Amino acid sequence: MDLRIDFASLTSAAGNLQGILDATERSSTLAQGTTLGAGYSGMPELSALGAAHGAVLTGGAGSALTILKNFAQQIDWGRYNLERNHDLFENHELGFAQAFTHGDLGGAVHAIKDLATARPDGGFGNFSFPAPAITPNASLADVIAKLTSTDTGQAAQAGESWNTMSAEAATIAAQLTNTAAQLQATNDGTAVDAACRVITDMAQVATQFSANAAHMAATVTYLATIPAAFTPSLVAMKTATDIIQD
């Protein structure tokens, strides 16, 4: 394969990846800032759902926070290696120019060393989302009190975070795809082809994360509507039963 290197495009691509890294880290901050958790509601079932949703955002393996941190490491790894390849190609070009000038071509030819560090682990992991256990309530009044104690703002805020992360991930995917296309159009060579494959892989991860985040946004937003959806009918039911004489 012929080698064709456009140094400006390598610099531009590395700059793009730095911007994408910054955006990914902002998304991590969104995930980390959620307040949704076990204190979501006085109703045990809703509390359990709040805890599970909170863990999907900020928990361990498979959580949005873990995925975004891993993804940021991948982006930073790609940016670092693009910059190193830029320097490597540039230094070799300078070496050949000096060799022709001084008539010492053999002394200027050095083996190109692989400066790439090991690629960080990335992708998606499994997460746990246990079904809440159903617990009996002493009375309708007890159910109503527990429902009305629910902090629906926590779920609404989590839904907004998921929606924002979904939109940002979609933008990141498009930027990565464009970066790979730009590199492919202006460069030829094994190293550049490998870089384009990695960037395209990262774009696919961002696309999948965007879709997953949109689904989670819809789910957790529905969670916020449960108290308002059921409390009025429960209050009406209690009012009707209260007038029944023993």
What are these regions (language model features)?
Residues 1-243:
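N-terminal secretion-targeting helices of virulence/extracellular proteins
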